[in-house]
Amino acid sequence: MKIINIGVLAHVDAGKTTLTESLLYNSGAITELGSVDKGTTRTDNTLLERQRGITIQTGITSFQWENTKVNIIDTPGHMDFLAEVYRSLSVLDGAILLISAKDGVQAQTRILFHALRKMGIPTIFFINKIDQNGIDLSTVYQDIKEKLSAEIVIKQKVELYPNVCVTNFTESEQWDTVIEGNDDLLEKYMSGKSLEALELEQEESIRFQNCSLFPLYHGSAKSNIGIDNLIEVITNKFYSSTHRGPSELCGNVFKIEYTKKRQRLAYIRLYSGVLHLRDSVRVSEKEKIKVTEMYTSINGELCKIDRAYSGEIVILQNEFLKLNSVLGDTKLLPQRKKIENPHPLLQTTVEPSKPEQREMLLDALLEISDSDPLLRYYVDSTTHEIILSFLGKVQMEVISALLQEKYHVEIELKEPTVIYMERPLKNAEYTIHIEVPPNPFWASIGLSVSPLPLGSGMQYESSVSLGYLNQSFQNAVMEGIRYGCEQGLYGWNVTDCKICFKYGLYYSPVSTPADFRMLAPIVLEQVLKKAGTELLEPYLSFKIYAPQEYLSRAYNDAPKYCANIVDTQLKNNEVILSGEIPARCIQEYRSDLTFFTNGRSVCLTELKGYHVTTGEPVCQPRRPNSRIDKVRYMFNKIT
């Protein structure tokens, strides 16, 4: 049986969850349509998703049509959940990008299409809600050509009045884009030679798989218009990106989920081989796990299975698998261009509204951060505050609602702040000797630090011979330095520097790796005090698309948000602004753009790097360590 995995992507309220329901219903996978309004859909299964009518976590379901099984990935549509989208994209064989006939191409549509193009995923456009009043499809087509791609093939003729009717083209007009994109076909056509339908279909298929051409279909998921035809298109146009014939096992973990009973589930896309119940499988070329329970989606329901084949999405109950873990042979994993998840750039303090629920909150955050790499947390040992780092405002609203709905914990949040970093200002060296007070450890360590250009990261090397200081001691020094780099002089992570282990001494009978591990961060702090550090703040590169009439407003507002515009282009009555902006300003700048353009602007951002800040440094409380803080205090007192 052929197995394909497709994604359903769209801007908020374009109808992707409703489309999923219609595909399941028309294929016979379910006998009754779910409703977004009533909260009975198969994929939006959390209370918050049902209340807001939006998808937040990736939903997975399936249907079978003739000899093809189709796994549907119903992905989120809001910017703050793009991490969920990106993780899901890597397992797709193809995508359906929904566009509302009423709303046209929205900001989020462009962001999603940008990601699909970057990942090289074959994509079909589906114009949804064509039965609504006041639809002008020619305007929608032009919108798609200007904002997404001009390389579209309109596959159907649509009559909106008196009744909506969609029929597949049989005339030559659907082949214009295909012919124009191939010099040989165009020359043949211009010379008056006949073109066979087969060669046109082959050319279309090649360009579709190469993501240089996009078939376009129409319908209404809610009114069940064009859905049967879309099912045929899905099963015939998309190919499975799996290894043919016998091969070793290879699968990739793309989602972690916890059930209401706190069972931990790992979602895995299989790319080759066969996975059997009770198999022992190597994970990321390291430890092995035993498959004790295995599920997959069959006609919209999760069912236990005893084997799964290449192309399938399986769900294992396992406590150790991590996101992006590879089961089996890592060399068989498809080489697809990777989109980096955005980095958490904000942090805040969270506490339970009821102090007695603190342990419940920590347990809940452990589960949530396990399934969402964009949420991280730690507990400040001095203040006992719980510090969260995250991406955006809506993400925090969702986490707050999730804690209340699933874990029954209400929380209070402080105003978020940006996450900074530190870099040494100059070269410096420092040595702490064994048996010289106040050093209580049976170790001597000498370190040097040198600043590096921005974006270099932290580099470490040892000039101490392994013949003199064995590997276990050397590893302990490196571990201690990495720990020390987590908190610089202002309490932020230390980066863009080279740290060299230059001198070490031990006493054979009594010295242990723990002595070196404990002393290393103390030496590092002292050498950083000699060097001094400067504060770095995150900057984002941005590209803004806005209607041309808003050029002056967008340009003039930029300095107010510390944005630096480096390039301006005019294209199709649209202005494209490129530049960079501090991460602390992007949320407000983006919100204002959306407001004064009435939602007609889109702002694409990615982390550019860190720049030196000006003004007073922002400090963060250090996380204490009971084993070394007393020694730190003594050294700080004498230096």
UniProtKB/Swiss-Prot annotation:
Database matches in SMART domains: EFG_IV
Keywords: Antibiotic resistance, GTP-binding, Nucleotide-binding, Protein biosynthesis, Transposable element
Domain tr-type G: from-to ranges: 1-242
UniProt binding sites for GTP: 10-17, 74-78, 128-131
Lineage: superkingdom: Bacteria
GO biological process, one term: response to antibiotic
GO molecular function: GTP binding; GTPase activity
Family: Belongs to the TRAFAC class translation factor GTPase superfamily. Classic translation factor GTPase family. TetM/TetO subfamily.
Function: Abolishes the inhibitory effect of tetracyclin on protein synthesis by a non-covalent modification of the ribosomes.
Descriptive protein name: Tetracycline resistance protein TetM from transposon TnFO1
Native organism taxonomy: Bacteria, Bacillati, Bacillota, Bacilli, Lactobacillales
Gene: tetM
